Amino acid sequence: MKEKEIQENMNKSIEATQRNFNTIRTGRANASLLDRVSVDYYGAETPIKSLATISTIDSQTISIQPFDISCLQAIEKSISMSDLGITPNNDGKVIRINVPPLTEERRKEFCKLASKYAEEGKVALRNIRRDAVDKEKKDEKDGLISIDESRDNQSEIQKITDKYIALIETKLSEKEKEILKV
């Protein structure tokens, strides 16, 4: 694996981890809270953002205006059944969600969830490293590169991995501060 390819794969893992972080509630209204909520729409699981305009009215309120009013009940049901712990208010045209402040206990749960997402991201990075190192060892065994080249490349791969793991740790720290901020 080339260094550029390794970094591209690791960047994808970082982006996936960030998307996971964005779905965690922080006590402030944020449209990305609903990214993981899907609606059973004509027999197919469809993301809410494909069915409606989602906007934040203020720091505590999210507004969902469906493109098709007939899916209003389905959207409301999906939000109610999600693990977000928020209750939608349906006025017949628009769904409003008041995002209540988080309790201390709920904040700790979300910090654990953020840690879990960070760990999943680190595992993905380590898998990319393992694949790259295995390729280096195979190339060395096949005589395509020298032992010294292989060791240098493996050392470089480890440095890249360490850099990306530190980036995930930084993002986790930022997310935890955001969650714990009252």
Curated annotation (Swiss-Prot):
One GO BP: translational termination
PANTHER family in UniProt: MITOCHONDRIAL RIBOSOME RECYCLING FACTOR PSEUDO 1, RIBOSOME RECYCLING FACTOR
SUPFAM superfamilies in UniProt: Ribosome recycling factor, RRF
CDD domains hit by this protein: RRF
Protein name as catalogued: Ribosome-recycling factor
Disulfide bridges in this chain: none
GO cellular component: cytoplasm
Keywords: Cytoplasm, Protein biosynthesis
